[in-house]
Amino acid sequence: MQKKNFYKILILFVIFFFQQNSFASIFEGIPRVVDGDSLEINDNKIRLFGIDAPEKKQICKKPYLIISFLSFQKKYECGLLATNQLKKLINNKTVKCISESKDRYNRYLSICYLKNKDINSWLVKNGYAVAYKRYSKKYILEEQHAKKNKLGIWQGTFQNPEEW
């Protein structure tokens, strides 16, 4: 009889534990843009899931003069550009972020939306971030689009943000 009760309690505990961890956290509000892939809404630190933007102080290169087979490149602050483009996109509007987990820095890993627009997708598709393939395959097509069309960081050379 005690063994039966033990298993019932164990099963209830397991069900309760997994239910607690399966619900998504939803954050809604006007965010503070921390950098090209991080936001803060009401003191909740949010990391945009599945993407990696250049770091704030990261420098990239883009062509400024092409003569026949020669290409001259100039440096630019691609990390600051990614941050500013995210600020410009959000433009003090309400954002909704849906998170199912946290990263090692205790930030919510989230897909964020401006109305119905996936912000994470927009950043990758326009070349302000790369698909973070180590953690997700979700934004690979958007990255291929940006690369093919030489948008954002794909117009020149850059060090992958993960390696910077």
Predicted regions and their residues:
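Small beta-barrel nucleic-acid-binding modules, primarily SNase/OB-fold domains
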Residues: 2-164
